[in-house]
Amino acid sequence: MNILFLMKVYDVGGIEVVAATLASCFVRHGHQVVIATFNPPEDLTVARTDPRVKIYTLDGYVCSSKNVASLRKILIEHNIQVVINQWGLPLVPCRTLNKAKRGLNIKTIAVYHNQIDTNARIKDVEIALEDCHNPLKRCLLEAKKAAFTMVTSKSMAYVYRHTDLYQVLSPSYVPLFSKFTGIKHPDHLMVQTNPVTLDSSDFDYSFDKKQKEIIYMGRIDYNQKRVYRVIDTWTKLEQKFPDWKLTIVGDGVERANIEKQVADYGLKRVSFEGFKQPKPYYERASILLLTSEYEGFPLVLAECMSFGVIPAVYNSYSAVGDIITDGKDGIVIPYHKEGYAAAEAADMLDAIMKDENKREQMALAAIEKSKEYSVEKIYGEWEKVFHSLLTNN
């Protein structure tokens, strides 16, 4: 089959890593795959993509006649049968694609990689509202939030109606999609989770090789990741567990603030590593702590579990329950509308930090659970999708 991935960008983000992993897997299984990206690709992501995958760069992120013509030429030259639009929002990729494929027998799939009813723009307004006590400004912010929410809802509904299949990452997002978009019976909505994108086939779990280390892996920002919560939790553990350490692997706009937070608290065993290859950290760490305000289907969860790292995750999005069974293969930290409870999270971590037998049991269960998200298993599900699309032509 001839498949094209349509990308807004092809850099080092999670969506791009998923696309690179799937594209490379499809090629290994005999498919012909090309990638078209509106903006120039990052060398690191290109390097992790199978060299048999040809990558084309369009002329910027716009639905222009030039981009439509360029994309149409790619579709025809490679006799594309299926396009996977990895940006289920916003409208530009969908509109450009539909103009480019006009008159061609091509099936389309749009994938939305986040929680259905929120995004960075909406969350920014909510953050501003938390700190605003001026009645007039609050009214303006509420109106802004309503406008952003409406635009997001209408855009999502538009893309859904102009694609053959629309994918979300969790079964729990199906009713949320209907509520958010107003589409009561979304008959071509489907659930498809992301694969583990990091190869752990050469990893042999040994409890004795695991260090007493908690890690955070990812971007350091306030809007989504809320890494300050990781530090708040660690402040309640550092003195009690002098042989444990916290390692922050990642970078971002909030890093300086988080480093200041660590200094202000007088914490001694916190290391900031910047962006690094995650595998060595997964191989040695015992626990991963993720305290995001919202997510879609975080790649780091299944990834860390495949290396026997126990995930401790704030239950701020419904997909958490798809991945983790609390107390068996991970820890689900309860969500509270009034805010993250660091003391409660610390108590839950405390229970396994001091219990080696429990940690080993949970690590082994996590490894077993991660197999549900192996690349080959997810590939098999994609094959069924392709078959269904083409046989229902």
Locations of regions flagged by a protein language model:
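Nucleotide-activated donor-binding/catalytic signature segment of Leloir-type glycosyltransferases, i.e.
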Residues: 54, 257-275
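Short hydrophobic beta-strand element within catalytic cores of glycosyltransferases
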Residues: 310-314, 324
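A conserved mid-protein helix/loop that constitutes part of the nucleotide-sugar donor-binding site
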Residues: 16-21, 212, 221-236, 253-259
